């Protein structure tokens, strides 16, 4: 089982969204703890996010990377589709 860690930016978004969205994100994070590689709607990213993956939850995106040796899933960014890929 993997451990979830949030970046500041991801934690900030997580704290300010509504309860329904938090529930959807929590459901996905529980699945990521079990298996960060085998979820549907997951895609390996390119360009500036190389080495990271993206999971889609409706119009929300979670960008994360996995450290297999330490069993950590690091949540880099959580946000709406239009905002998550901006710097």
What are these regions (language model features)?
Residues 30-54:
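A short, surface-exposed loop/turn module that caps and links secondary-structure elements
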């Amino acid at each position: 089982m993997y451990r979830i860690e949030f970046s500041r930016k991801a934690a900030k978004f997580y704290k300010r969204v509504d309860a329904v969205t938090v529930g959807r994100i929590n459901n996905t994070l529980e699945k990521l703890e079990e298996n960060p590689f085998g979820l549907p709607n997951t895609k390996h990213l390119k360009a500036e996010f190389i080495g990271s993956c993206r999971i889609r939850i409706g119009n929300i995106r979670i960008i994360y990377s996995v450290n297999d040796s330490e069993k950590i899933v690091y949540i880099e960014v959580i946000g709406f589709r239009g905002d998550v890929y901006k710097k």
